[in-house]
C-alpha cells in the first residue's frame, strides 16, 4: 500500500531541509510509548528527527532507493559520505548529529525502522558491512544477527570495518557504523523505562529479542584488538545494553545486545579470564566441540558454535575438494546433524556458513536442510530472499 503520493516525496525533502511539518500517526499504541504521565504535545520536526513516513522495514528501504534523486541529502559531519542513501536514511532515522532531548519512543529510529517487521531470529547477516546501509538494512528485515570484520588502524587506536585491508576507509569506523547507532536506538526506546535492569531491545514488536553482534578479528595483534574493542563497547556497557556473564554470581545476564568474537580472537589464556564480568563471548568451533572439553562452556564462555558447511562435510568424509553439492550435503545429513546436536547438548546455538548462493534452488534446498537439522542461524547474503523463505 503506497502511503505517499508525489507530493509526499517533496514532504520528505522538506523534512531534510528542517521545515516544520505536522503529520498524522497511523500507528497503534505500544508498550514502548505507553505509560507517560505527561500530556501529549505536538513537537516541531527537527533536522535530526523528521516525522515518521508511516512505512517501515523493507518498504522504507525501497522508498529511499526509488526516491533518492528527489531528496536533498544533508552533508552531515561524522557520517560515511560515500553513500547518499546511507546519509539520507540515517538522517531520517535521527541517527545523525546530536541526539534529541525529547523522549518519544514512538518517533524513535527503532519505531521508524522496525515497527511491524517480523523478527528473523534464525538468520545471520553475512558480511553485513558490505551492504548499502550496514546494520540498518539487516534490522529493517528483522535480522537478529550481524557481523563486522575489524582491523587495527592508526597505530592501534582505531578499529575500521572491512573485509580487505586495502579497501578500508577512515569513515568506516566500528563505532560510527555499529556501536553508536545501536546505542542511540536503544537509548531512545528506553528513555521512559523505569526498569533499567531489563531494557527494551532493538526490534519494536519484539523488544525481548536480542541482537547478536559478531566481531571478526582480522589483525594479527589480537590482544590489542580485544583491548581496543572493550573501549568501543563502553557506551553499551555503561547503558546496561550488553549481555554479560557475572563471574561472582555465576550466571548469564541477558541484555538487548550480545557480542560474539570470531576470527583471530585471543584466548582467555592470552588476555586473562575477564572479571568480574565477561562482556564478549567466543565463537566456539562447531566441528571440534567433542574434542575441546569444557573450553567453550555455554554462557560463561560461548553462546554460539560455528563452522563452514565445507569443513563439516570434510569431517564427514563427503567432500574431498573445495566444492560441495546439494547431493553430497544430503548424503551427509546423518553426520552433519550430530554436530548440531552436540552444540545443543552443550546449550550452545549452532551456525553453519559457506553455503553456495547459486543456483537459488540449491541454496534454498540447503536452507531447508539446515533448518530441518535444527541449525539456529542461517548465514545469509540475500536478506530479501530469506525474508520470503
Curated annotation (Swiss-Prot):
Which InterPro entries does the UniProt entry name for this protein? AIM6_PI-PLC-like_dom (IPR039559), HAT_RTT109-like (IPR051236), PLC-like_Pdiesterase_TIM-brl (IPR017946)
- GO terms (BP aspect): lipid metabolic process
The record's keywords, sorted A to Z, are: Signal
Please indicate which superkingdom the organism of origin belongs to.
Eukaryota
Q: Which GO terms describe its molecular function?
A: phosphoric diester hydrolase activity
Tell me where the signal peptide lies. 1-23
| PANTHER family (alphabetical) | ALTERED INHERITANCE OF MITOCHONDRIA PROTEIN 6
What family is this protein classified in? Belongs to the AIM6 family.
Q: What is this protein called?
A: Altered inheritance of mitochondria protein 6
Species annotation:
Eremothecium gossypii (strain ATCC 10895 / CBS 109.51 / FGSC 9923 / NRRL Y-1056)
Amino acid at each position: 500500500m503506497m502511503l505517499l503520493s508525489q507530493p509526499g516525496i517533496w514532504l520528505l525533502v522538506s523534512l531534510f531541509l528542517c521545515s516544520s511539518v505536522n503529520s498524522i500517526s497511523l500507528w497503534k499504541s505500544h508498550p514502548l510509548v505507553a505509560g507517560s504521565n505527561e500530556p501529549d504535545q505536538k513537537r516541531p520536526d527537527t533536522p535530526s528527527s523528521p516525522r515518521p513516513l508511516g512505512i517501515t522495514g523493507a518498504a522504507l528501504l525501497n522508498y529511499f532507493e526509488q526516491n533518492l534523486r528527489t531528496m536533498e541529502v544533508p552533508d552531515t559531519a561524522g557520517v560515511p559520505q560515500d553513500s547518499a542513501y546511507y546519509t539520507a536514511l540515517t538522517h531520517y532515522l535521527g541517527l545523525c548529529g546530536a541526539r534529541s532531548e525529547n523522549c518519544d519512543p514512538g518517533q524513535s529510529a527503532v519505531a521508524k525502522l522496525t515497527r511491524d517487521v517480523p523478527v528473523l531470529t534464525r538468520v545471520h547477516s553475512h558480511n553485513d558491512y558490505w551492504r548499502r546501509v550496514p546494520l540498518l538494512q539487516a534490522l529493517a528485515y528483522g535480522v537478529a544477527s550481524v557481523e563486522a570484520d575489524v582491523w587495527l588502524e592508526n597505530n592501534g587506536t582505531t578499529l575500521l570495518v572491512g573485509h580487505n585491508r586495502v579497501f578500508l576507509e577512515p569513515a568506516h569506523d566500528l563505532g560510527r557504523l555499529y556501536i553508536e547507532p545501536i546505542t542511540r536506538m536503544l537509548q531512545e526506546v528506553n528513555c521512559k523505562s523505569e526498569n533499567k535492569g531489563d531494557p527494551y531491545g532493538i526490534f519494536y514488536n519484539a523488544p525481548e529479542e536480542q541482537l547478536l553482534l559478531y566481531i571478526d578479528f582480522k589483525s594479527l595483534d589480537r590482544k590489542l584488538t580485544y583491548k581496543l574493542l572493550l573501549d568501543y563497547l563502553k557506551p553499551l556497557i555503561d547503558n546496561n545494553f550488553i549481555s554479560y556473564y557475572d563471574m561472582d554470581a555465576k550466571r548469564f545476564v541477558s541484555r538487548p545486545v550480545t557480542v560474539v568474537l570470531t576470527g583471530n580472537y585471543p584466548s582467555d589464556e592470552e588476555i586473562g579470564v575477564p572479571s568480574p564480568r565477561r562482556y564478549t563471548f567466543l565463537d566456539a568451533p562447531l566441528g571440534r566441540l567433542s574434542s575441546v572439553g569444557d573450553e567453550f562452556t555455554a554462557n560463561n564462555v560461548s553462546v554460539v558454535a560455528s563452522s563452514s558447511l565445507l569443513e563439516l562435510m570434510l569431517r564427514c568424509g563427503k567432500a574431498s575438494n573445495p566444492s560441495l553439492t546439494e547431493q553430497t550435503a544430503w548424503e551427509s545429513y546423518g553426520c552433519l546433524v550430530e554436530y548440531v546436536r552436540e552444540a545443543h547438548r552443550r546449550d550452545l546455538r549452532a551456525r553453519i556458513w559457506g553455503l553456495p548462493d547459486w543456483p537459488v534452488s540449491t541454496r534454498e534446498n540447503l536452507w531447508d536442510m539446515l533448518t530441518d537439522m535444527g541449525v539456529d542461524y542461517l548465514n545469509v547474503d540475500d536478506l530479501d530472499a530469506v525474508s520470503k523463505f
